[in-house]
Amino acid sequence: MHPDVEQELAYTLLIELMAHQFAYPVRWIETQDHILGEVNAERIIEIGPSPILTNMMKRTIASRFSNSDQALNINRHLMSPDNGNPDIYYKYEPTEEPDLPELGSQSNTVKVSGSPAWEVQRPVTASHIPSGPVDEIEDTKVPVSAILISLLAPKLKKDPRAIPMTGTISNLVGGRSTLSNEIVGDLLAEFPNRVPDKPEEMPLSSLSETLSTSHDGQLGKATSALVMKMVSSRLPGGYSLSNARLYLREKWGLPPRRQDAVFLLALQRQPTSRLLSSTDVDSFLDANAAAYFGQENLSIPSRGSVQSAAPAVDAKALLLAKQQNDALLRDIMGVIQGHTAAKNESQDATLQASDSEAAATKKLDMWISEHGDDYAKGMAPIFDAKKQRIYDSYWNWNAQDTILLFQRKLQGQMSSVKELEQLSTSIVNRACGRTLEQLDYIIAQAERDPTVDSGLLKPMQLLRQTCVETQERQPVFINLSPDMAPLTTISSDGRLIFSEIPRALPCSKILSTNEASSIAFPVSRADGVAVSYSPQLTEILCHDLKDSRRSGFSFSGKNVLLTGAGEGSIGNHILRHLLAGGARVTVTTSSFSEKVTAMFQSIYARHGSKGSVLRVVPFNQGSHGDVQNLVKYIYADASWDLDFILPFAAISENGRDIEDLDSKSEIAHRAMLTNLVRLVGAVASQKRQRDTITRPATVVLPLSPNHGLLGNDGLYSESKRSLETLIPKWSSETWGSYIALAGVIIGWTRGTGLMDSNDVIAQAVESLGVRTFSAVEMAANIVSVMGGRFNAECQETPIIVDMGGGLGSVKNFKAKLTSARQELNAYAELKRLTAQESSRDKAYVATDAHAKTSKRLRGRANILLPLPKNLNYEVDIAPFAASLDGMVDLSRVVVITGFAELGPLGNSRTRWEMEESGTLSLEGCVEMAWLMGLITYHNGIDKKGDHYSGWVDTKTSDAICDDEIPGKYLEFMAKHSGIREVEPEISDNGYDPSKKESLIEVALQRDLAPFETSIETAETLKRQHGDKAIVTQDASSGNCQVQLKAGAVVMVPRASRFNRTVAGQIPLGWTAKRYGISDDIIEQVDPVTLFSLVCTVEALLCSGIIDPYEFYQHIHVSQFANCLGSSMGGLTSLRKMHRDRYLDRSVKSDLVQETFINTTGAWINMLLSSSSGPIRTPVGACASSLESLDTACDLIMLKKAKVCLVGGFEDFVEDLSYEFGCMKATCDTDAEYAAGRVPKEMSRPTASSRSGFVESQGCGVQVLTSAELALEMGLPIFGIVAYTSMAADKAGRSVPAPGKGVLTNAREKSTIPNPMLSLGYRKRLLELRRTQIYQNISDHLDILNSEIALFQESETASPGDLKAFRENRELRIRQDAQAQDAEVTFSLGNQFWKSQDAGDISPIRGSLAVWGLGIDDISVASLHGTSTVQNDLNETMVIQEQMKHLGRRQGNLLPCVCQKWLTGHSKGAAGAWMVNGCLQMMNTGLVPGNRNADNVDEKLREHRHLAFPNTNLQMDDIKACSVTSFGFGQKGGQALLVHPRYLFATIGRERYDGYISKRDKRWRKACFRLSEAMVQGNMVSKCIKTEAPYTSADGVAALLDPTARF
């Protein structure tokens, strides 16, 4: 056959094989069987770049055909191009030939143009050899300084030569903290785990030296990304980074690291646009390489040459041909592997791993079979230092406890003397100068208050005296545990009930009744293996026990490791005692969770004393690794060198005898013995390494008298008994200098996890002569052993204390115990049966009337709007009425008559319930379930065919009663509301932080397959890509085929994971449609407008306004203003306008209008209020709501409006979330999860561990009116807006930096009290001015009489004219007088302080004095409290300095509320939510605690006027609140709200009673409307207007007539 025909057939065969491969599924096993079995092929060749199939076939031959091949003498040869080229082509080693002569003019050329693309080309032989590559120069590390400059230059937008190495990052960025954070983030990415603390404050030269010490000389993540970005965006398509490296190596001889240095230079010299050809790239690389050689003083390499008569073959052409050939082979293999890779790789991996997996599986099965699952799980390590919790803010909890003590005593809420004793002891143990100031203030206030019982003063005075006496001493643990005896009773229905009662006899006498010994706790001394009773040590212990109840023991400065401190355990009570004594304790927990850490935090908050510290870490004592890591963690800080070790961790093995020992018994033995010993040894090793022989750690060994005594407890007894062998080892081994041993034989202890099932027989045990103990008693005894003189004796020799209570000395104890248990159970069973029989007898003999049981009443929700608390006029108002009556101009007093919100916790009512109690009431559950769409109201035929009126499940339509709603939906509501993982289903554009979309620019390296599109689209593609887009038109369809060629630049979507995955979204299921808003409006407006519409209607309902047009019965349409603000407005619309429009998605044509921030206010006016008054749209970032409040107050006080809607709104969207994350303003949720935090813990204002705010979304609205209008209409008044102000900061370069401009609200220079601050003084001045006004009226009336007399004499006017003239003039005279009265009242009342000399009276002092209040009357401060480090420090400093400057009394601590721990930070809406919270606080007197403030920042301790409660404080009276907000862009805002009782004191009893009557009537109607709206789903739709309050014909006249009402 002719070679050309063979070649053609081979080509056809290959194509057919590939087509078959593509068209049919891979059947590799059958193929192998056919080739190897049926055909018995011996010569097998694989076509491809690597031997994938032949390797798999080799394993098949070895496993299945090796024996048969040997028997049949079959010799198989498996070949592939990479290892069998000569054999494939039947080429053999040529014979050796003599050296060729010098190359001459011969020229060997091969014609290749006619060869098929797949044909392997033969090498070209040229008569002229080109110049060879240059020699590679020696490699060297990339200097860190070059990397730093490369990172800084593009960020600073400076020439690299203009960046001095002596400068710092902070100086270079010019105060722009965001840019500084960004650069530091790049450094952390470039040099992971090597960047020093605060690198931005180090000179670049020092930073470079520091980083150079451990740098590997290669580019890191940040610079590599910059280089890759340059290659993809500036070099032509198809030109990769590897091409550039190859060019630099071959032409310039540069090794990899020097290539990196050239790329760094290239970053600084990037072309402004993409290079178009490889020639341009070569020039670009040559220029940068030459610059590098010059920079490094290297000689530019020269190439050698070889003379030849033949023309040289272009090396670049050869390289290009090779690259094209390689690309072709990759394409072919890619096609093949695309159809075979999945199965082949799976089979390959299976074959390779089968043997090793089988062996590993066999070994694992054997291990599991021997040890068991419990053992395997029980030794899994859980220690993680990142999850540590540190509690040391005892100073704040002491202030909180002092407030709680006084409030509970004052309100009669102290549950017992024991609680009073505990609180008082805790306060004394933490007393400092601040505590004394606080007590002084409380006592002084109580003495001045005639309503305070004198019996309250005495304990407070005694407490203060004790604090004075103990202020300088160290904290002490005092054993206050009562001596309790067990008591078991049996109820009438046969239930066993365990309780504890005080023992009848003194403790000392009870202890002496032990059968085993006449001494309570005998002490033995160990001498090697010999253990002997020591009367002297026993006596010492007795004295220590007595001292523990008298003077107590201090553990100040002592470091303790405690394992096994679960709730109710002995270790848990030991922890309380140690903290009370001032110890620094590291406690471990094997069940690390939010609940567990909260338990330990509450223990520290109550018992932690001066200097005490509590560290909590996860730890599994069954894990050897955890033991080692725990000890390393402790000794990483030398100040934590241990003084005591209490290894009390234990695992219950109840119910296991020697026939039932299992893997749990083994892991329990490992935890309670093996690893306990390892723990002691690891500590000894650390002390040995540090040569700490003067500070041995005392190990309290938890021994047991139960040496098999009780039985059925697995290996518990063996574990405890084996611990005793440590005692002789103390002297026989070498670690005795570092460890002291105190063995404590722990007797029967009631109420612990190991013994709680036996509590009911404790009384029977004591009847056997055994002393049992409560967990509190046993813990106090053990701590007494640690704290007294007894501990010093342990340092000399191991000691054993027998606190077994005689348990080990009772003969036949198990039998007696079993008998007692049987008797008890038998008696209980008898009573149970008797009770059952008695019940049956009663049922039998009872009459029908008695047998009937009343039907249980079902709980029903009564959802009501908030109503200001009814006040007792004589008690709450009358005391102020005498001085305040008539002292303000009510038309210019601003009051809040209604409020509403939509946020992560639903509306303002459900949010307050969560803030107040942490759960929802029945009403809250029903409202939240309705709001989330879980229930809907049904009135009609139900599923059963009956008529039903009530709530039904939205999904199933099943009827559901109100009281069933919490049980069915509460868990779901809690999961899908509040701060939580971002839920894509309710996020804008389905945003999922785990799949954050972005585009990357890619230059195509090969032609894409053609795709069909329209002519218009084809034209746009051609316009963009030019000759890189080939367009062909299909005449039949009219469409085009477009093919993008290599070099075309396309944007490819990618999904990355963003580490801000938690936010405070509105509750899942919320929809505006539920409020009756139509689909066309929902489709038209931005989501924030929907939020605002709902909140506006609900705020109006809260004001008692069912129809917004009701206002126009009392005011003109020009007197209704809208001041809602936001930081960014319609973010969803902004995203659509920019991103969706760019991506050519469907976007409505009028979208741009929804991006304007003022559009929301416009929609509210167009749909609801139809006002002609001002629309003010404040944009104050996070302070937008307070700026809105400030704007509205100005409008009302200037009489430009009488009603204002105020507040703010904000959305949560992907872009804003990402940008906040880039600024490091929000918390890194990945780091939070790594620290063991759950989403609801991640917003922690004022906490020492806070790390940034958590975003949220929503809206908040208040209705503001003048007090005069509110009283006239009977609107509920929730608070007086006494003062508002906005303030900027100072010169700087950081936009988000928190400012101090709000301090100006306290500006005043005079230290001498201004008499105008006296309400009585101003009242006298006002009365004097009013007398003058009244006299002026009389004078003008006399003049009027004279004028009328003249008219009468002239006889020119009729009597009717004279009468009209008199009436008109008298009216004007009296109106002028009223205006003068209002003006003088305003100047001497509302804003008297503004008329004083500049700086004489501060705005805060003056606005409070208007209502007869002072700086000490501010009862609570609602902080912006974002949970960022700098804001919380700055804001508290501002409030502290205001209080200090204005003379707030020492000890009058101002509770600070940080609402964002619950709601997150909603930016524009945040201030409105805070105002709502303050109104609710004033109405209830409750100050809610920041429950996420587990440990308050030590830096806040210096603010002596402030307190940071993490629990609720019930105050008797909240007179005034301060609200502060700080927004990006130097927006600082502060408002003062005052309780409405002070307003009511200005109007008189009669007017007040009339107002209350109108208010209550209005409130009842509004509540009915709220219920109706929930049932009918028309809360908003019923208020939506289609026409103005006036007819179109009357429109002009209505606007021009100020007296027009509708």
UniProtKB/Swiss-Prot annotation:
Species this protein is from: Gibberella fujikuroi (strain CBS 195.34 / IMI 58289 / NRRL A-6831)
Pathway recorded for this protein: Secondary metabolite biosynthesis
Active site, per annotation: C1182 (for beta-ketoacyl synthase activity), H1424 (for beta-ketoacyl synthase activity), H1465 (for beta-ketoacyl synthase activity)
Protein name per its UniProtKB record: Fatty acid synthase apf5
Family that this chain belongs to: Belongs to the thiolase-like superfamily. Fungal fatty acid synthetase subunit alpha family.
Residue ranges annotated for the Ketosynthase family 3 (KS3) domain, each copy included: 996-1539
Job description of the protein: Fatty acid synthase; part of the gene cluster that mediates the biosynthesis of the cyclic tetrapeptide apicidin F (APF). The non-ribosomal peptide synthetase apf1 incorporates four different amino acids to produce apicidin F: L-phenylalanine, D-pipecolic acid (D-pip), N-methoxy-L-tryptophan and L-2-aminooctanedioic acid. L-Phenylalanine is the only proteinogenic amino acid directly used by apf1. The 3 other apf1 substrates are non-proteinogenic and have to be modified by other enzymes of the cluster.
EC numbers for this chain: 2.3.1.41
